[in-house]
UniProtKB/Swiss-Prot annotation:
Catalyzes the oxidation of 5,10-methylenetetrahydrofolate to 5,10-methenyltetrahydrofolate and then the hydrolysis of 5,10-methenyltetrahydrofolate to 10-formyltetrahydrofolate. The gene is folD. Its EC number is 1.5.1.5, 3.5.4.9. Belongs to the tetrahydrofolate dehydrogenase/cyclohydrolase family. InterPro entries: Aminoacid_DH-like_N_sf, NAD(P)-bd_dom_sf, THF_DH/CycHdrlase, THF_DH/CycHdrlase_cat_dom, THF_DH/CycHdrlase_CS, THF_DH/CycHdrlase_NAD-bd_dom. This is Bifunctional protein FolD. CDD domains: NAD_bind_m-THF_DH_Cyclohyd.
């Protein structure tokens, strides 16, 4: 049986540390601030934003959610971003994705001041990460790296396979693993013989967005398995991309869904907001 990596517990420990940091800063007259721009009524987005608000309130970060209509024009949204770029009360700006079809996501992310891009999605921040000089790092892969650290999982010389190639998880995850001297393969839905490729991995990170897609046929016994998936099954239950029950029988470490990667993503968002406040003061 695997050791289950408890993301909720680790997130709580880290948030307690961040809270101490915020208390010190507040005594010096600096309160870290985060603004979230939420466009439309997407229920999943609303849940994520509520979780972010809750974490910010617990830690002592000033947080504001700017709810904007689904019909907002690109120009109006760009004007909102510009307003918060100029507002010194807010050290972090986050645009909750996905955006409505009529808005160019890339253009919106480019408009955020890179110093306030606490999600780490701005091309300048991704570029810094890829030349090995990171400033703001996408929060999900960053949180996963903290999990490896907390559980003393050594990455040097290990074979790592990342299933998923998004700019939010897959590509930055591969780069962070590379920076820790892992040998990295990026696979995806079009990879031939995907199960065989995955089975080579000592470290398997799955972010493909398909419920219970990775079964034990994909996993080498003793591998570390990180599940980034957030899917709903037919009963509406939250499930990961990995078939937890069967894979946990052969993996050495595994993250559950829920209470795995999700809480760490939010924690790293809070951490980067506080770090941004320190740099901007």
């Amino acid at each position: 049986m695997s050791t289950v990596i408890n993301g909720r517990e680790l997130a709580d420990q880290m948030q307690a540390e961040i809270q101490k940091d915020v208390e010190k800063m507040t005594q010096q007259g600096i309160q870290p601030g985060l603004v979230v721009l939420l466009v439309g009524e997407n229920p999943a987005s609303q849940t994520y934003v509520r979780n972010k608000e809750r974490a910010a309130a617990k830690i002592g970060i000033l947080s504001k959610v700017e709810k904007l209509p689904e019909t907002i024009s690109e120009e109006e949204l760009l004007a909102e971003i510009d307003k918060y770029n100029q507002d010194s009360r807010f050290h972090g700006i986050l645009v909750q994705l996905p955006l409505p079809k009529h808005i160019d996501e890339e253009k919106i992310l480019l408009a955020i001041d890179p110093k306030k891009d606490v999600d780490g999605f701005h091309p300048m921040n991704l570029g810094r990460l890829f030349v090995g000089k990171p400033e703001m790092i996408p929060c999900t892969p960053y949180g996963i790296m903290k999990m490896f650290e907390a559980y003393d999982i050594d990455l040097t010389g290990k074979r790592a396979v990342v299933i998923g190639r998004s700019n939010i998880v897959g590509k930055p995850m591969a780069q962070l693993l590379l920076m820790k001297n892992a040998t990295v393969t990026i696979a995806h839905s079009k990879t031939e013989h995907l199960a065989e490729v995955a089975k080579e991995a000592d470290i398997l990170v799955v972010a493909i967005g398909r419920g219970h897609f990775v079964t034990k046929e994909f996993v080498k016994p003793g591998a570390v398995v990180i599940d980034v998936g957030m899917n709903r099954n037919q009963e509406g239950k939250l499930i990961g991309d990995v078939a937890f029950d069967e894979v946990s029988e052969i993996a050495s470490y595994i993250t559950p869904v829920p209470k795995g990667v999700g809480p760490m993503t939010i924690t790293m968002l809070m951490y980067q907001t506080v770090e941004a406040a320190k740099k901007q003061k």
